[in-house]
């Protein structure tokens, strides 16, 4: 009813709804941080392309699994130019998957794979999401696999370690639990995200990381406004 009440909107509905809302927000001149896998706006992973994204009025935060795994895949791609295939497998607690996530599983896979292609340059990719009903609830974690011939593992390890430090700047619970290893012709690594436990359960790190990514982008928008 009052579009002047804000300058920026966080949309955490569903992919199909955001496709409708995006046109309305654009007409109203409002920036949108899209937390659904709609593939409408520019894809953003703050540790990779934050500065590039603030020039766009509609920015997509990909998915929780994308925010977790793509930084590691990107770091590997920065150290290795001959990656043939990348696969990411994300596992989250069933209790942390709300109706929006469950309604958008196909969109989740498609958007995560699109983000993976865009950020790494590797066109042959696959994303898998597992909802684990175990009790007690598991922490959010992602495994990253990259098919590479004769990699420079020292360079890969250094690149990934640097990325983990960048991630911790805005996601304190981000942790490398299996550092990059090379076996059977592929690089494998695993990370997990433990939430802060302030508003959401600690096991819901998948929700914390996409929230933290969105807040980081919003803060960058605000800095840009203040500087100009």
Model-derived features: where do they sit?
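Solvent-exposed, flexible loop/coil residues
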Residues: 44-52, 203-207, 211-213
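An acidic intrinsically disordered interaction segment
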Residues: 33-38, 179-186
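Internal hydrophobic alpha-helix adjacent to the cofactor/substrate pocket in enzyme cavities
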Residues: 211-227
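N-terminal Rossmann-like NAD(P) cofactor-binding subdomain of oxidoreductases
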Residues: 1-83, 87-89
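Active-site-lining helix/loop region of Rossmann-like oxidoreductase modules
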Residues: 67-184, 197, 201-204, 211-212, ...
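Short, low-order "capping/linker" segments at domain edges
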Residues: 184-194
